[in-house]
């Protein structure tokens, strides 16, 4: 099952400040168990990041901010990234430090489609699950 969530800016700020992920575990929800693919996108006017990933079994696990934060940490997000792309007019996909423009896609479907096949060509493989 494919699920889409929003990662709040304050969690990205934690990465920018260099906080360790394991130090945040106490104050954030239980970790989710995930599949092998995921991506992130940011839209103009906010610093929120949209995170999509495939969940192995949604009945047993759920999406939470800590898991999304772990994903974003894999991308080496910097303050420059946040300032540059949050202020941009376009929607981008973030993949291991690379940014791919998604202007040719339907922006409305980015946030509502539970099975966004248009993004299947660009997976984020991280090799771990909780």
Q: Model features per residue range: what roles?
A:
Residues 1-130:
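Structured alpha/beta reader/binder surfaces that contact nucleic acids or chromatin modification marks
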